[in-house]
Amino acid sequence: SHKAIATGLTPNTTYSYRVGYDGNWSNIKSFITANTNKEEFKFLYMTDSHIMDNEYVENARWSAITAAKQAPDAKFLLFTGDFVETGTEQNSEWEWEQWFEVSMKPLLSRMALAPTDGNHDDTPNLNYTYHFNTDKAFNETATVKPQFDGITYSFVYGDALFMVYSHQDFWRGSYSYANGTSTYLSNDVANWFRDQVEKYPDTKWRIAAVHKNLFTGSGHQADEDGALFRATLLPVFQELNIDFVIQGHDHIYEVMGPINNTTKTIVPGSVTNVELVSPDSNKNPKGQQGGTFNVKEGTLYFVNGTCGRKRYYPYTQDEMEAGFDKHKVEGYWDLFTGKYGQPGAPAFSEISVSSSEIEVKTYTSDANAQATLFDTFKIVKNGNTGIEENKQSAKLYPTYAKDKINTTESDIIRVNAIDLTGKIYPLPFDNQHIDVSNLTDGI
C-alpha cells in the first residue's frame, strides 16, 4: 500500500500527476481542487458493487462509464460501501484490483473518491484501510477504537458539510440490542457529529453518508442492528438538523421522508409535487415518482439501488407490518414518500448542490453506456412551507378498481383517510382527483 498527501494546493486549480518510479511511470492524470466559494457543484453517488466475478466487474464498469459520460463535470464520487464481496474473510485483493483498475477506472482518473465502509469490506486483514487515505482524526480521539482507520471523516464542498461514518463498530464497547444502546455510536460517533456541525455552522446543507440503513424497505428492514442504529442516532440527527442521509446496503431505490426523527413519522407539509404513475410491483409498487422534499424540520433518507449486479426487491405493506415486532416503526409503509422499487439495472445518481436546493437525478446504465432516467427529485429547506390544511370529510364508496373522489380545492399537498381506529391512510391524488380504489370497506 502506497499513500501520499499533497499539501499547499491552491483552490480552483488544475494539477497534473503521475505515479510510479524511474522507468515505470503511469500516464499523466489531472484533477481540479475545490473552489472556496459556495457555488453550485455536482457529485456522483454509487453503492454496492460487490465485486466478486467478471459479471459484477462489468456491471459496475457500465455504471462508471455511463456516469462519466452523463456528468463529466462531477467533482467527486461518493461510494457508500460494499466495494467488494469477500467480507468476513481475508479479502481477495483481486476484487479490489478489479474495482480500481477496471470497474471504476473511467471515473477515478478524473475525480476524487469519498469512500464509505460497508459490511462486506470488513476483513481481519484490514484490507479496506490499505486502499484509501482518508482523515484519521476520529480514530485518534475516540474512546472506543474502531477496527479501521479513516472510516469516519468529514469534508466541506461548496455549501455542504459531508459527514461520512460507519455503523460497523457499534458492538465495540458496551451495547445491547434489547435496549437499543451502543456506547460507540451514542458517545464517540454522536459527539463527532456534534463537533463537525459546531466546526462548520454556516454550511447550508448537512449530509451524512453511511452504508447500513437507518430506514429501508427491503431485506434488511427488520435487522436488529438497524433498530439499534435508529435508537442511538435518530435523536442526534434531530438535534443537529441533519438534512440528507445517503445510504447503501439494501440494493433497492427508496426515497423516505422527510422524517421527524423523534416520532419516526413524516413531517406534515414537507412533501410536494410527487407525481402519480401506474404502479409496478417491482419497479414502483406505490406508483410515485419525483417530488420536492422540504427538510427544514426533518431528514430525507435515500438509497439509489446498486451500481452492480446484486439486487433486492421492495417489501409490500403487509410484509412491513408483519415485521413490526422487530423494526418497531409504526406506519413504515407511509415513510416512502417518493419513488420506491427496484430499478432492475446498474444505477448511479448525479446530485447537484446549490445554496437553494439539492437536485438528485438517478439513472440506470447498460453495456452501451446509455443512461436512462429512473427518477429525479429536489430537496429544499424553507422555513415556512406556506401550507394550510383544509380538513374535510367525505363519504367514500370504493370499488377496488378505479374509484376516485373529486374536490374543488386547489394546491393540494396531501390527502389522508382515517379509519375508526385512528389509523391514517395516505391517498394518492392527481390535481383535484383523489384515488380511493385501494381503501377497504368501512373507511
Task: Describe each PLM feature range.
Residues 1, 25, 126-208, 213-222, ...:
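Metal-dependent phosphoesterase/phosphodiesterase active-site architecture
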Residues 17, 360, 414-415:
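Generic short beta-strand
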Residues 1-117, 122-149, 187, 191-195, ...:
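Divalent metal-dependent phosphoesterase catalytic cores across multiple superfamilies
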Residues 388-443:
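C-terminal outer-membrane/trafficking sorting elements
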Residues 2-4, 349, 432-434:
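Short strand-edge motifs at loop-to-beta-strand transitions and within beta-strands
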Residues 75, 111, 203-205, 413:
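Short coil/turn segments at beta-strand junctions that form active-site/ligand-binding loops
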